[in-house]
Amino acid sequence: GRLWLLAALAGSLAGDVLLLFPGYFVPGLVSFLLAHIAYLVLLRQGMGWFPSRGALAVTLGVGAAMYAFLWTGGLPAGLRAPVAAYVTVIALMAAQAIGRATVQRDAASRAVAVGACCFMLSDTLLATNKFVAPWPLASFWVLTSYYAAQVLIVGGWLRGQTVAQAGVRPGAESLRFQ
């Protein structure tokens, strides 16, 4: 599991660096896409694919709505396919995280699910600012939601692994950490 976590963090770091430079949006997008695939595989461990069909439908619906908003808001034609792929993958990652939380029903998996949703929020804010209309303090809100996402996903995952290794039954752990 830790290799997938490290791969997700490495992909995110590469994306962070690439997005600092003009003209590197697509390579940065691809780096984050690979990071989300790594998170998706990580969150699949010990669990079926998309255990909550409702979460899958909602996250894909939110992703489709965001993509339509970007399309009509000025997303360049050359970015439509890469952005569509990215939106699909991040929605799948969020669906897997939410589904995992519905099965495990503990604080750690809920933190991961909230983190996945924060990632979707961060990317929505970033894309809206970049392709639709710039807005005040965009960088602050994008980075705040992005770092919250990473902290919640990584911290939640590591906490869940620690609890699992300690042999605490699912659900009981949430009482200990509150």
Which residues does each predicted region cover?
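Polytopic alpha-helical membrane-helix bundles and their juxtamembrane interface segments
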Residues: G1-Q178
